[in-house]
Amino acid sequence: MEHGSSRGFIWLILFLDFVSRVTGKTQVDALIALRSSLSSGDHTNNILQSWNATHVTPCSWFHVTCNTENSVTRLDLGSANLSGELVPQLAQLPNLQYLELFNNNITGEIPEELGDLMELVSLDLFANNISGPIPSSLGKLGKLRFLRLYNNSLSGEIPRSLTALPLDVLDISNNRLSGDIPVNGSFSQFTSMSFANNKLRPRPASPSPSPSGTSAAIVVGVAAGAALLFALAWWLRRKLQGHFLDVPAEEDPEVYLGQFKRFSLRELLVATEKFSKRNVLGKGRFGILYKGRLADDTLVAVKRLNEERTKGGELQFQTEVEMISMAVHRNLLRLRGFCMTPTERLLVYPYMANGSVASCLRERPEGNPALDWPKRKHIALGSARGLAYLHDHCDQKIIHLDVKAANILLDEEFEAVVGDFGLAKLMNYNDSHVTTAVRGTIGHIAPEYLSTGKSSEKTDVFGYGVMLLELITGQKAFDLARLANDDDIMLLDWVKEVLKEKKLESLVDAELEGKYVETEVEQLIQMALLCTQSSAMERPKMSEVVRMLEGDGLAERWEEWQKEEMPIHDFNYQAYPHAGTDWLIPYSNSLIENDYPSGPR
């Protein structure tokens, strides 16, 4: 009997292995079909060179992300200079959640078969040359939240089936669509901006009442109703004055873009218990962050800005806030709404229960597990994707100016979410000139920004490089405690000194307890050093960082950089134990400024 059970168990293992191999091979076939359709030109071949048809699973390929069951969940091929057509075989990726093929030269039509991707959350095909209709089959995608097809050549009518989707973001502008704009379902929340520059008929205005013999009665009824509402409003105002701060009147809340909302001050006073100290999540240079609970029981984080206001800045503030709200990406903290009164400026964000990377690294509650190495790698990639989107894919480029572990938040799945972006410009909305105040945090500020006050996307790249070192070491970017051991107070300088002594193991966070892949640590350090070069021009763009983190081009960039830099430095370069790689240590500078703790928010 025992022998039979063992045999049955072995057969079960063999069967599961067979199923796994068949599933993996199906995914390989689907992606190879995509490669065959898109592989034109030397650059494209380089982008997809790791896609090997002989592999059992595609999970080791560049630009492909898998879950723990080796199912493909994400394709990241945005801005990859691809040409060709989409293929119906993409439907053979049943667990695909994110299909990112924006800003290429893709032609042809959207395959109907994409409607079979039942796990799809985000479909980004914008900025291509795709033609034909929007497939009605997309209406079957019950989990689709982000649909961006703008800047293509799509034609025909908008399928009514799309109105049933739980969309948070919709943009099908700048196409050749015709017919009516649906007004029901999720489409009711989107403004005309989502449909602009098409051949669509405008949405019908609300019908006006036709003249009749009862018009006088209607007027009387309306007047009576208005009087009743006025009396009720007066009573409520008297009733609420004992429970709320008395503030000047503000505009009624309204929806601007998607679910972006203007909240009333009273809503947020109730949500935060009048900005109670016990709801404080953190303090920063832009203001205080509070935990809040809305009337529908949704948890939010409310940032109470502390900037000085001058007369006439309200419209510019609202414009900048709406611009920030349009930056929507899986790895960006989405702005849910705002509140603006003569005395308050408030921003409302989703609440992040897992806090920030900084809090997970250095303020972890007792009993909570440390961030393991796979999570840290995933955080590095996710935050890079978010920053790359801010730099390259927003209508107006957004430079963060304070990239650090405390501003990289973690959602319920420990996905990295870049927070506090756009605030540097927002807080200067009354000033059209270059600011003389250098914004940022000690240890993260790029030397050229510190010396000249001029910022660029490369300023963020520097901060990102330091954040990578925080992920690897678990330490703060600036820490006076290191003086006790005669070490550099700047994390970047300390890392350089340790690397000169070839003590890689002493760099890695002790909380990992040795559970990391040494070659992967080396690669992240290489990336951090490339990002923190003293010359802004020599640093990679964030889009390049994403590709290198996905395994595309890091070795070549590192080798090239070493050859260029080696004659400049006067200390001895010894090959660090890593496949003939020299560790090159460039110069950097920093500014002393306080940082703030950041727990769940």
UniProtKB/Swiss-Prot annotation:
The modification Phosphothreonine is found at residues 272, 298, 435-436, 441, 452, 532. Its main location: membrane. GO terms for molecular function: ATP binding; identical protein binding; protein serine kinase activity; transmembrane receptor protein serine/threonine kinase activity. Glycans are attached at residues 52, 81, 105, 129, 151, 184. The chain crosses the membrane at residues 216-236. LRR repeats lie at residues 71-94, 95-118, 119-141, 143-165, 166-188. InterPro entries: Kinase-like_dom_sf, Leu-rich_rpt, LRR_dom_sf, LRR_N_plant-typ, Prot_kinase_dom, Protein_kinase_ATP_BS, Ser-Thr/Tyr_kinase_cat_dom, Ser/Thr_kinase_AS. Its EC number is 2.7.11.1. Autophosphorylated. Pfam families: LRR_1 (PF00560), LRRNT_2 (PF08263), PK_Tyr_Ser-Thr (PF07714). Coiled coil: none annotated. One of its GO terms (biological process) is protein phosphorylation. Residues 237-601 are cytoplasmic. Residues 1-24 form the signal peptide. It is found in: Cell membrane. SMART domains: S_TKc (SM00220). The modification Phosphoserine is found at residues 356, 359, 451, 456, 506. It is a single-pass type I membrane protein. Belongs to the protein kinase superfamily. Ser/Thr protein kinase family. Interacts with TMK4/BARK1. This is Somatic embryogenesis receptor kinase 5. It comes from Arabidopsis thaliana (Mouse-ear cress).
